[in-house]
């Protein structure tokens, strides 16, 4: 939309003229068996509340839903306790007890017709596990790339670890569906 006059209307509101080039943004789009009400897609991004204050993250996404977004995603969500990035705070979906707070978030995303998405993450070489004290797992045995320069060393994953990682993603995906999410992004 573009302003049709600099001064606006007599009522003091700006007059907007429709620009047909942008109509495609307001069209529905099919994603597999689902349909998004428009093409406005809120990518996964953190707000700092994470598991400590999931209600703040839910309310932030509720505002986006009210604003008319077609697809709204959570922030990066840790899906296993061997992949946490303390001191940074993210959402968690380690076990079933994490489902209720994420269910509330999915419900708030959907209240105005948006599709709710969750990003499931395994931080690997970026996860120092300061909270859980687990030895980090990564493709290779290298120092963890933290922002705090702490001396943490990753263990190279073997075939058993890779099978476990796949199982952890499957379990987290099932929990995501139970929580009411429509879309899942693996990271």
What are these regions (language model features)?
Residues 121-181:
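Non-globular sequence segments
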Residues 1-123, 130, 154, 165, ...:
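N-terminal capping/small domains of soluble enzymes
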């Amino acid at each position: 939309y573009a302003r049709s006059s600099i001064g606006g209307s007599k009522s003091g509101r700006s007059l907007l003229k429709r620009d047909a080039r942008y109509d495609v943004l307001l069209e529905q789009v099919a994603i597999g068996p689902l349909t998004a009400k428009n093409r406005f897609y809120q990518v996964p991004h953190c707000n700092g509340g994470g598991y400590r204050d999931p209600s703040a993250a839910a309310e932030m996404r509720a505002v986006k839903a009210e604003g008319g977004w077609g697809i709204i995603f959570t922030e990066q969500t840790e899906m296993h306790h061997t992949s946490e990035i303390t001191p940074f705070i993210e959402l968690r979906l380690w076990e079933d007890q994490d489902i209720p707070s994420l269910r509330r978030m999915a419900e708030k995303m959907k209240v105005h017709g948006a599709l709710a998405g969750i990003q499931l993450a395994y931080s690997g070489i970026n996860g120092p596990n300061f909270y859980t004290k687990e030895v980090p797992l990564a493709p290779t045995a290298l120092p963890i790339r933290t922002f705090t320069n702490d001396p943490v060393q990753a263990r190279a994953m073997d075939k058993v670890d890779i099978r476990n990682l796949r199982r952890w993603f499957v379990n987290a995906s099932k929990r995501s569906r139970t929580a009411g999410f429509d879309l899942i992004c693996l990271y």
